[in-house]
């Protein structure tokens, strides 16, 4: 290449760089405008929320002294206020917000809000794939530990994988909640409890008590992974159909339990879920019995018994509540 050609090419590169600088300058300006607009929206939403709260208090004061026609109007306005809160929730999903305590402890004060619907859905889809792949890996790990490798080291690797899996799920779910996912209640707390349980299992030293409970725990892990795989497979298909019909949010997630939207074609999962819940109770009873054994010296036995009992109560009562609510609604629909 001649020097003249090099100079010509360098001139073109210089022009490209100047254009790039101009484009980046415009980008920074737009970014500042976006930040200002985000702050304005957040401020307006908070102001409107306060006004609605004050208005609702005044509205309930009028309700006590109003006649029948006025009460109907008050109820109508009250229903609109509830819908407005759902609208605020959707708006705030696209605005930066302060992280909760857990995300602050893990990530610090980092903005985790994804600005586009496409980015939110992609992150949610990646979360679902992560759950599926790790469920399969945990299933294979539990089968290997139960039937092939009877070593404490391999058990520790399996338990460490469980701790890492549930820790990662809690972080990802917290990010999804910050971005507008409506997963809440016990199905969020459930993973924190499972993280704690897996951590205690990891610290349980090898001994007579551990060996007595080992096979029962691994068999439970195999069953639980199989049920979770079934849930993912059928729930993801059901959610896809409901989203296509506009009946579910695009950030709704598959869960390890049973929710009201699953009545359409997923009731066959209920026997498996209840069996798994009662297996958790059986684990708790077994561990309570072991904790009273003369040879039991480990604190992990009693703590694990309490944790399995907590998981049983949370899972069983939450599932039972969903089933009971559905039956009550069906009764009201009947003439």
From Swiss-Prot:
Q: Does the keyword Transmembrane apply?
A: yes
Among the GO biological process terms of this entry, one is: fat cell differentiation
Where found? Nucleus inner membrane
Task: State the Pfam families in the record.
Answer: TMEM120A-B
Alphabetized, the UniProt keywords read: Coiled coil, Membrane, Nucleus, Transmembrane, Transmembrane helix
Regions annotated as coiled coil: 1-40
- Tagged with keyword Isomerase: no
Q: What Gene Ontology terms describe where this protein resides (cellular component)?
A: nuclear inner membrane
Give the highest taxon in the source lineage.
Eukaryota
| Mode of membrane association | Multi-pass membrane protein
Q: Which InterPro entries match?
A: TMEM120A/B
Where exactly are the transmembrane stretches of this chain? 100-122, 130-150, 157-177, 193-213, 268-288, 300-320
Q: Spell out the family assignment given in the record's similarity comment.
A: Belongs to the TMEM120 family.
- Role of this protein: Necessary for efficient adipogenesis. Does not show ion channel activity.
Q: What is this protein called?
A: Transmembrane protein 120B-A
Q: Name the species this protein comes from.
A: Xenopus laevis
Upper taxonomic lineage: Eukaryota, Metazoa, Chordata, Craniata, Vertebrata
Q: What gene, per UniProt, encodes this protein?
A: tmem120b-a
């Amino acid at each position: 290449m001649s020097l003249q050609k090099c100079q010509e090419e360098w001139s073109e590169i210089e022009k490209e760089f100047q254009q790039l600088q101009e484009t980046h300058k415009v980008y920074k300006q737009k970014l500042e405008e976006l930040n200002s607009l985000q702050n304005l929206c957040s401020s307006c939403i908070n102001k409107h929320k306060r006004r609605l709260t004050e208005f609702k208090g005044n509205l309930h004061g009028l309700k006590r002294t109003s006649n029948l026609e006025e009460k109907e109007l008050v109820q109508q306005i009250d229903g609109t206020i509830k819908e407005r809160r759902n609208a605020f929730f959707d708006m705030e999903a696209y605005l930066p917000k302060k992280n909760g305590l857990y995300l602050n402890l893990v990530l610090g004060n980092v903005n985790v809000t994804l600005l586009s619907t496409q980015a939110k859905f992609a992150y949610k889809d990646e979360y679902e794939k992560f759950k599926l792949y790790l469920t399969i890996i945990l299933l294979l790990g539990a089968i290997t530990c139960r039937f092939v490798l009877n070593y404490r080291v391999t058990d520790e690797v399996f338990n460490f994988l469980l701790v890492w899996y549930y820790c990662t799920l809690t972080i990802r779910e917290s990010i999804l909640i910050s971005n507008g996912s409506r997963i809440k209640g016990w199905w969020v707390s459930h993973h924190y409890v499972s993280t704690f349980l897996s951590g205690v299992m990891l610290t349980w030293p090898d001994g007579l008590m551990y060996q007595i409970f080992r096979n029962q725990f691994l068999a439970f892990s195999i069953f639980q992974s199989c049920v979770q795989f079934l849930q993912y497979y059928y729930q993801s298909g059901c959610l896809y159909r409901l989203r296509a019909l506009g009946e579910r949010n695009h950030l709704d997630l598959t869960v390890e339990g049973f929710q009201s939207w699953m009545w359409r074609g997923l009731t066959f999962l209920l026997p498996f879920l209840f069996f798994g819940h009662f297996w958790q109770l059986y684990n708790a009873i077994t561990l309570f019995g072991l904790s009273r054994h003369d040879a039991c010296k480990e604190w992990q036995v009693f703590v694990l018994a309490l944790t399995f009992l907590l998981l049983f109560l949370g899972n069983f009562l939450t599932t039972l509540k969903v089933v009971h609510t559905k039956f009550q609604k069906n009764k009201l629909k009947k003439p």
